[in-house]
UniProtKB/Swiss-Prot annotation:
The lineage of its organism: Bacteria, Pseudomonadati, Pseudomonadota, Gammaproteobacteria, Alteromonadales. Tetramer of two alpha and two beta subunits. GO terms for molecular function: arginine-tRNA ligase activity; ATP binding; glycine-tRNA ligase activity. It catalyses: tRNA(Gly) + glycine + ATP = glycyl-tRNA(Gly) + AMP + diphosphate. It comes from Shewanella baltica (strain OS185). It is an enzyme of class 6 (ligase). The keyword Cytoplasm applies. Pfam families: DALR_1 (PF05746), tRNA_synt_2f (PF02092). Belongs to the class-II aminoacyl-tRNA synthetase family. This is Glycine--tRNA ligase beta subunit.
Length: 689
């Protein structure tokens, strides 16, 4: 079979930078799915993307589908011939339809009888005749929330399309994509190189675009180039560039020919908290801030332009002029905000509604303050600081800085708290109350910070559930799933001795008569338990391990985590499978017992050697297990229980539990109940697979 490389490019207006990677990846995934459906073999496939183009390159694509042999079954032999052995009209009609005679048909014998059959050879279709339709279907399935029309064209896409190129090796594939006829014309950079040129071969795409069109079409190459050049530029001025991957991705999506330059701003702006300056540089201008070795912001920034200028100083000056007003705004807001303490802003929180049924932000901070103090008392943190931090927690939302630069909430609260003379614990809690902000973010570690962060999240969870607005489907307007994961992570990762039932009850009490849902506390607990399952699954913990622990309904997250770790370790032991099966058997036996389960073991009724051995082993272990259970050392407890395997196996081998003698039966049931209870101190091991 012959192979050739395929190139498909769509030339467009500037594509949304934050969607560029997703569009390109989806285009490739959709198209390779089409190739697979069409039984077209290929070696590999990659995507390319730049602000004004999406492209895919498929290497060693088969030039035609493989020929197939298709089995076409005809009538049964019994009905294909008459009494004289002549073909019936049905048989002749079937044969004629397949281009053969009845005599040329083969026979197929199955368990249901014998049939006429024709193994027809179907020649594969040429690839070039399939490409356009497959590419169009791949484009039609792209994740485009708001497609647009342009000109008189009825076709819709995320941005207007100007060119389409489909080359199989050197051969131009005829057809249309989004109403644009396939041609060899590829557009270059807007301001450099050739505005357009003819592409002779699919293999020339990257090189020709770079040399003739001054476009680096490979997204990853641009990204790597920008990062390397930015790091070099920062090193030249004795600093280190702050290059977050999300910003790097966005910048790489904005330029076709990246040129990295270094600029500066007035040192007086460094008197403003660096977070505000960084926010405007990164968020508004897409610049990379530069820090010194000590982590202090330098009066410089690195930016990426889309053109090689003969006068880069002019471009640098232009960018410095653009960013200066934003930095001046930050300076003005900071100096203005400093004139008022955070405490003085408390009355203004009464003018901001948190939620109609749950009151204002002032109501919320009052609840957070009380709940944070309650949590601090439970964890040994400073309750006075926790109450103070909770009270001030939302006051920075009323500052000019946060109103203008919203992502600095919490961070500016920390800076203003320090300026106001609040304790360091209160100041840090102002910033850390929102942690974790996203998956993978760190959790607060300081006691006061943990108390405030938990109080804020629990107040929202209980309040929103309390008014009957729990998340439904994918909708989660109050980000309750994130809040729930935050609660669990803070408690687990800091090993805090907190019980969810107590926390929910306290939060509910603080809401007073605001809540209309009588089942709110139960629903919040169930919601948190469901988040536990999702969180551990994301960490790679087996569902059976999670269900085994959930069966015991532990409501202390730190304790829940200890059980998860213990059961995960237990499952790695050689004895675990046999003991899980034995526990399942015990559960089934005990489930059939009517009335209360017997609990007292009479040593005089242990008549079989195997039951005597099991009882002796349990008696030996119980004094060792009791302190382990009391100290939540579940892993060591299960390790000791794993030593029961041989005794349990022998018991089920030799002993008839449901004996005819009622006393013997009840004694054996009591023994099994005792065995099961030891494991249930940790989890329901019978649920392990």
């Amino acid at each position: 079979m012959n192979f050739e490389n395929l190139l498909i490019e769509l030339g467009t207006e500037e594509l949304p930078p934050k969607s560029l990677r997703k569009l390109a990846e989806s285009f490739l995934a959709n198209f390779t799915e089409e190739l697979t459906k069409a039984d077209l073999a290929f070696s590999s496939a990659v995507w390319y993307a730049a602000p004004r183009r999406l492209a895919i390159n498929v290497t060693e694509l088969a030039l035609a589908q493989a020929d197939k042999v298709v089995e076409k079954r005809g009538p049964a032999v019994s009905s294909a011939f008459d009494a004289e052995g002549k073909p019936t009209k049905a048989a002749e009609g079937w044969a004629r339809g397949n281009g053969i005679t009845v005599e040329q048909a083969e026979r197929l014998v199955t368990d249901k009888g014998e049939w006429l059959v024709h193994n027809a050879k179907v020649e594969g279709v040429e690839t070039k005749s399939l490409i356009a339709a497959m590419a169009q279907r791949a484009l039609d399935k792209l994740p485009i929330p708001k497609p647009m029309r342009w000109g008189n064209n009825k076709t819709q896409f995320i941005r207007p399309v100007h060119t389409a190129t489909m080359l199989l090796g050197s051969e131009l594939i005829e057809g249309e994509l989004l109403g644009i006829k396939s041609a060899r014309t590829v557009r270059g950079h807007r301001f450099m190189g050739q505005a357009s040129f003819e592409l002779a071969h699919a293999d020339h795409y990257l090189a020709d675009l770079k040399e003739k069109g001054k476009v680096i079409a490979d997204y990853e190459v641009r990204k790597t180039l920008i990062k390397a050049d930015a790091e070099k530029a920062a090193a030249k001025i004795g600093g280190k560039a702050d290059i977050e991957d999300s910003l790097l991705e966005e910048v790489a999506s904005l330029v076709e020919w990246p040129v990295v330059l270094t600029a500066s701003f007035e040192e007086k702006f460094l008197n403003v908290p660096s977070e505000a300056l960084v926010y405007t540089m990164k968020g508004d201008q897409k610049y990379f801030p530069v820090f010194d070795e000590a982590g202090k912001l330098l009066p410089n920034f690195i930016f990426v332009t889309n053109i090689e200028s003969k006068d880069p100083a002019q471009i640098i000056s232009g960018n410095e002029k653009v960013v200066r007003p934003r930095l001046a705004d930050a300076e003005f807001f900071f100096n203005t905000d400093k004139k008022h303490t955070l405490e003085s802003r408390l009355p203004s929180l009464e003018t901001v509604l948190f939620q109609q049924q749950l009151g204002t932000l002032k109501d919320k901070v009052n609840r957070i303050s009380a709940l944070a103090a309650f949590i601090a008392e439970q964890t040994g943190a400073n309750a006075v600081d926790a109450a103070r931090a909770g009270l001030l927690s939302k006051t920075d939302l009323m500052t000019n800085m946060v109103m203008e630069f919203t992502d600095t909430q919490g961070t500016m609260g920390m800076h203003y708290a320090r300026l106001d003379g609040e304790t360091e614990a209160v100041a840090v809690a102002m910033e850390e109350q929102y942690k974790p902000k996203f998956s993978g973010d760190t959790v607060p570690s300081a006691g006061v910070s943990c108390a405030v962060a938990l109080a804020d999240k629990l107040d929202t969870l209980v309040g929103i559930f309390g008014i009957g607005q729990a998340p439904k489907g994918a909708a989660d307007p109050f980000a309750l799933r994130r809040a729930a994961i935050g609660v669990l992570r803070i408690i687990v990762e800091n090993k805090l001795p907190l019980d969810l039932v107590d926390l929910i009850a306290k939060a509910q009490a603080l809401h007073g008569t605001n809540l209309s849902n009588a089942n709110a506390s139960d629903e919040v607990l169930e919601f948190l338990m469901a988040r536990f399952r999702a969180w551990y699954q994301d960490k790679g913990i087996g569902v059976d391990v999670i269900l085994a622990v959930l069966a015991r309904r532990p409501t202390r997250p730190a304790d829940f985590d200890s059980r998860i770790n213990a059961v995960s370790h237990f499952r790695s032991l050689e004895a675990s499978s046999a003991l899980a099966a034995a526990n399942k058997r015990v559960s089934n036996i005990l489930a059939k017992v009517e009335g209360a389960l017997p609990t007292t073991i009479n040593a005089n009724l242990l008549t079989e050697a195997a039951e005597q051995a099991l009882a002796a082993k349990l008696n030996e272990l119980q004094p060792l297990l009791a302190p382990l259970f009391a100290n939540a050392d579940y892993q060591q407890a299960l390790t000791l229980l794993a030593g029961l395997r041989e005794s349990v196996d022998q018991f089920f081998e030799d002993v008839m539990v449901m004996a005819d003698d009622e006393a013997l039966k009840n004694n054996r049931l009591a023994l099994l109940n005792n065995l099961r209870e030891q494991f249930l101190h940790v989890a329901d091991i019978s649920l392990l697979q």
